[in-house]
Amino acid sequence: MEKSVSGPNIFNMKLLLLLLILTISFCYAFNNETLKVRLNVPFFKFFSKNGHHVVDEEIPKITIPEIRLPFSSSIGHGVVRTDDLKIEKFSSPKIDFKLSKTGINWWTTGGAIKLSGRWHAKFTEVITIRDKGWLNAYATGIQMNISAAAYQLDGQPQVKIGDCTVQIQKLDVEIGGSVLSWLVNLFETPFSKLVKKVINAQACSAAKGILIEEANRFLHSLPSHVDVGANFYVDYFLTQNPHATSEFTEFDLAADIVYGKSLCHPINIGNWTDASSTPGMLTSWISVSIPNCLIHSAHQNQLVKLLVSKDIPVVEPYLRTSCGFLGLCIGKFFKKLRNEYPNNHVDLFFHTYSTPYFVMSEKEGVMLNMSLAVDLFINPYAKTKQNILARLVVDTFSTVEPFLNHTRIHGRLQNSTITARVDFSNIGDIPKAFLSAFSSILSMTAREAVRSVLGVGIPIPSYDNVTLADSSTIEVFDQFLRANIDFEYK
C-alpha cells in the first residue's frame, strides 16, 4: 500500500517548530564567550499565547501531499488518490509548555481544521473506468505532546525532537460527487480509514523526518556574518550546547559587531551576574567587547569623520586666514597663514586618532574614551588634503547612558571632558591662546563625533510584528551590560 503523509497534526507540529526556531534565533555567537542569552518562562508563555499569530500566517502556506490508496474487489482492481487537497478553514489551538533540564515540552489542546480537495479514481475490470468527486476532512480537538531540545553543530543552532504523541478527539471524512456510486462503495470505507490513519498516526514521524531535517538544514545554512544595517555585521558562533532548567533555557555564545569585512577577536571580560528578581522574558548579558569591536572596526574603516569648513555659517568668520584688528580668526594666531594664504579659509578635518574604547563599571556607568585628530588644511579640503598644515588631538572622556530604542541598544551622551593638545605643526608654534579661543569649536565638533559613534547601536533580534515592550530595562555592571527584555505583539 502506497501512501503519502498529511493532516492537521503536521500543521500543529509546524507551529511548534516555528516557535522553537524563533527561540533559537535570539542566539548570536562567534568564538570567545561575550554574550549570554537566557530565555525565561515568561518568554515561552508569550510566544505560546501569541503563537496563533504565527500559525494564522504560516498554515495557509502549507502544501499538502497526495494521499493514494490501491483497492481491489472480486471483479477488478483500482486506485484512488487525492488532488488539490488544501486548507479551507483553520482554528488555532491553545499552546502550553513546560521547561525541564532536558529541554522543553509543548502540548496543544483544541484547534480544528477543515481540508477540502478532489479525489480521482480508476478501476479496471475488462476495461478501465474513471471517476472523480470532492473530499472534505474535519478534525477537531487536536492534541499533540512533543518534547524538543536545541543543540549546536558547527556553531549553528539545531533542533531535535524527543517524544511525540498525537490524539484527535474527532475526525470525519466525507467523500462525494461521484456519478458511479458502486465504484465509491468499493473504496470509501478503506480510503476514509487511510485518511484518518495518515492524519492520526503519521504526523510525528513525518515531522521528525521531514520538517526537522529541513529546519536543521536551514538553521545550519544560516550565515554567520549577518547584516544588521549600514554595512555593519554580527559575527556569531554558539560555543556549547544550551543549558536548560525548569526556569529557563540558556545559551552561551561569542559575538562581535564589525563593519564590512573587518575582523575582531573579542574576549570575555568579567563574570556574569545572576538575573535580577524581575528578569523579564529574556535576559541577556553583553560583554563590553561587543561594542568595542564595533568602534574598533569603525576606526579601522575611518567611519568617524567630520569636516568643519566655511560652509558652516556660524564658524566661517573664525576659519579666515585674514581678519581685522578687532576680529578673531585663525590667521591672527599664525603669521604663515596670513602671509602665504591671505584672504582664504582653513578647513578642520576631524577623525579618530586612535582606537576608541568603552569601559563599563557598576559604580561609574558606561564611559567612552575617544581621541580625535583635527587636521588643518587650506580650503577646499578636497583639493589640498595632501598638504596638512597642522594636527591637533582632542581627547574626550564621555559618560554614556545606555537605553533601549526599538530593537537596538543605544547610548545617550551625558557629560564629556574634553582637552586639546598639539601633535605637530607646519605653520609655526601653536599657542595655548589659540587652543583656548577655539575650544568651543573643538568641543562642539568632538561631541558630535561621539554622538555619531553612539548612534550605531547594538541590535536585538526581533521577529515579524514582535517588538520590545516599554517594561524592558538595561543595567550596567563591571565590563558588561545586562538587559531584561519584554516583548509585545503589534
Curated annotation (Swiss-Prot):
Q: Name one GO molecular function term.
A: lipid binding
The entry's cellular-component GO terms read:
extracellular space
Query: Which UniProt keywords are present, listed alphabetically?
Result: Disulfide bond, Glycoprotein, Signal
What family does the entry list? Answer: Belongs to the BPI/LBP/Plunc superfamily. BPI/LBP family.
UniProt-listed Pfam families = LBP_BPI_CETP, LBP_BPI_CETP_C
Q: Which organism is it from?
A: Caenorhabditis elegans
* Signal peptide segment: 1-29
Q: Does the keyword Methyltransferase apply?
A: no
- Taken from the UniProt record, the cysteine pairs bridged by disulfide bonds within this chain are C164-C204
Which SUPFAM superfamilies has this protein been placed in?
Bactericidal permeability-increasing protein, BPI
Q: Under which name does UniProt file this protein? A: Uncharacterized protein T19C3.5
Query: Which residues does the annotation flag as glycosylated?
Result: N32, N145, N271, N369, N405, N415, N465
Q: Per its UniProt entry, which superkingdom is the organism in? A: Eukaryota
Note the PANTHER family from the entry: BACTERICIDAL PERMEABILITY-INCREASING BPI PROTEIN-RELATED, PROTEIN CBG15266
Entry-linked SMART domains:
BPI1, BPI2
